[in-house]
Structures are given as structure tokens and as C-alpha cells.
Amino acid sequence: MDIILLERIPRLGQMGDIVSVKDGYARNFLLPQGKALRANEANKKHFETQRAQLEARNLERKSEAQKIAEKLDGQSFIAVRSAGETGQLYGSVSTRDIAEIITDEGFSIGRNQIELNHPIKMIGLHTITLSLHPEVQISVVINVARSTSEAQRQAEGETLTSAEEIYNLQEEILEENQEELLVEEINDNDINSPHQEA
């Protein structure tokens, strides 16, 4: 199907370009979203009369996106999720989750603006690209951790998924437990031992 683009669309074309796309892509996405018109004579004339308004509206959206980008670019957001010892999440962090996290911080982001090739399934720092406008893209960091304290440690550069870290943490816990058991055993011996008289 031939269509007229009403805005710049990555890997497709610029505003005003007449391009050929698959029928389903046009019918299900581009036309309902108002990103394109069918390329017939009536729509070509309509586009030419509305071109100045469309360009002005596009410029306005771009400037709004740039204002948001200045505040949001490089920001870090924390996602607390349950994970196993190796850092494998029990679920995943999807575009919907990321959109909720960023929106909770006061920014209006839709899940369709998040470029994520696959869901996040490991704890760690993940750089995500946000497309605020076809011409404005920024990067944010999603810090996926088991707790906020772990997220802070990760932000400081500590890796929480390496075998050394896991075993060191387990050894520390074992040492603490052994110390507690020794203290309890000593206390029990003091209580249970009969007092010897001299």
C-alpha cells in the first residue's frame, strides 16, 4: 500500500514522503495512529494544503520532547524485583514496567516510546533508549536489583551476580551464623553447668 507520511518515521522516511508499506502495517498502525494517509489524489492535495500546519505541529512536539529530554537524559531508575542467587529474575522487566517506573517519577512516557529488543531478565544496570519524538532519542539507565540497598551498591559499581560476590556474601552469612551459634552455646553452657563450690 502506498502512503503519505505525516511525520518522520525511522527506517521508512521523512514527512511528506510517499512510501510503499505492507497493508497490515498501514491499516493497523500508521493510519490509526495518524502517522500517515493513503496515497491517493485527494489525500495528496489535502496534505499539501495542511503541510505548513503539520510542520508547525511537528516542530512544537519536537521542542516539547527536547525539554523533557533535557530533564530525563542519563537519569537512573530503580526496579526492585525478586531474583535468584545468580541474578536471574523470577519474572522480567518489560516496556510496561519501565513506563510505569518512569511515570511514577513524574515523567509521562508511553510503553511504545521505549526501545527494548527483549525483556530484561537479569539484575544489573541496563541502558534503555527512549524515543520521545522521531528526531529526539535519549538514554536512561534501569537499575534492576533485589532491594534498594542492592541498587545503590550496583550504582556504585559493585557487581552482584558474579560467583565471587555470591560466595563472599554466603561466607559472611555463615560466619555470622557460626558466631551466633557459639555465643548461644556458651550462654547455654553457663546456664546448664552446676556451680562448683570450693
Curated annotation (Swiss-Prot):
A matching Pfam family: Ribosomal_L9_C
Keywords on record: Ribonucleoprotein, Ribosomal protein, RNA-binding, rRNA-binding
One Gene Ontology CC term in the entry: ribosome
Lipid biosynthesis among keywords: no
Keyword Plastid attributed: no
Molecular function terms, GO-annotated: rRNA binding; structural constituent of ribosome
UniProt xrefs under PROSITE patterns: RIBOSOMAL_L9
Purpose: Binds to the 23S rRNA.
PANTHER family: 50S RIBOSOMAL PROTEIN L9
Family per record: Belongs to the bacterial ribosomal protein bL9 family.
HAMAP family reported for this sequence: Ribosomal_bL9
Protein name: Large ribosomal subunit protein bL9
Native organism: Bartonella tribocorum (strain CIP 105476 / IBS 506)
Gene name of this polypeptide: rplI
